[in-house]
A protein has these predicted regions:
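RNA-binding accessory domains that recognize and position tRNA/RNA substrates
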Residues: 1-184, 194-224
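Conserved G/P- and acidic residue-centered "switch" motifs that form tight phosphate/ATP-binding loops
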Residues: 190
Length: 225
């Protein structure tokens, strides 16, 4: 299955109120830095309360996911398949095709969650979810619907195109680097200082590391360490 984009989920940033855009912009900046090291032209966009990474036609999926997993501020990465918006019947066919490709022979519980960002769409979110769920059951008779605690949540977002995803890959969490001041980190040569640096960086602090080497009192082995 070829994924055309990634939906980026974040947690703490969402409660920042009127300052939320500052944290979102910082997260987008860090994502662009991480993705710039990968071959291909990626586009990171904020759209109606969401952050998406739009991928080039040819890209390394595993390398892209790994880069995003190391960006503080991201709690979840959802691989997205994008379909053209050509009416409900075509959307239903596309969603069933997605299930057949990503979850062949599925026999567990599921629910369809629809988000209608395109408010001009003539069918409500609940109606879309119910109808799509029925179409999926027709193709997967051993599956069952559970709207409270499903094993699989199939998300459908109706925008200018149809965005479909069902997987969330765990991110690093925390806050984007640069949103909570700066700090100096003294690297002592042990494991404690880099761990402390990682933990404070995860809270959005920009770290500058310092190491003191004082020969002959500091051995070459300690320097290498």
């Amino acid at each position: 299955m070829i994924f055309h984009a990634f939906l980026i989920k974040y947690a703490e940033i969402a409660i920042k109120g009127k300052n939320r855009y500052i944290f979102e912009d910082a997260l987008v900046k860090q994502m662009n830095i991480a993705l710039s090291k990968i071959e291909g032209e990626f586009e990171v966009k904020k759209e109606q309360g969401r952050i998406y990474v739009f991928c080039p036609e040819q890209y390394d999926y595993d390398e892209t996911v790994d880069a995003l997993q190391h960006v503080f501020g991201i709690v979840g990465i959802c691989p997205v398949v994008i379909y053209e918006e050509q009416g409900f019947e075509q959307m239903a066919k596309d969603v069933v095709s997605y299930m057949k490709n990503c979850h062949p022979n599925y026999n567990g519980s599921f629910k369809v969650y629809t988000r209608r960002a395109k408010k001009s769409y003539p069918i409500t979110s609940m109606e879309v979810s119910a109808e799509l769920g029925g179409r999926i059951l027709d193709e997967f008779p051993d599956a069952s619907v559970d709207v409270h605690d499903p094993e699989l949540t199939l998300s459908v977002e109706i925008r200018d195109k149809i965005y479909v995803y069902s997987q969330t890959i765990k991110g690093a969490g925390g806050m984007p680097i640069g949103t909570n001041g700066k700090a100096m980190l003294l690297l002592s040569g042990g494991i404690d200082s880099p761990v402390a640096g990682y933990m404070i960086a995860k809270r959005g602090v920009k770290i500058d590391a310092v190491y003191f080497h004082a020969p002959p009192y500091t051995s070459e082995r300690a320097k290498q360490k």
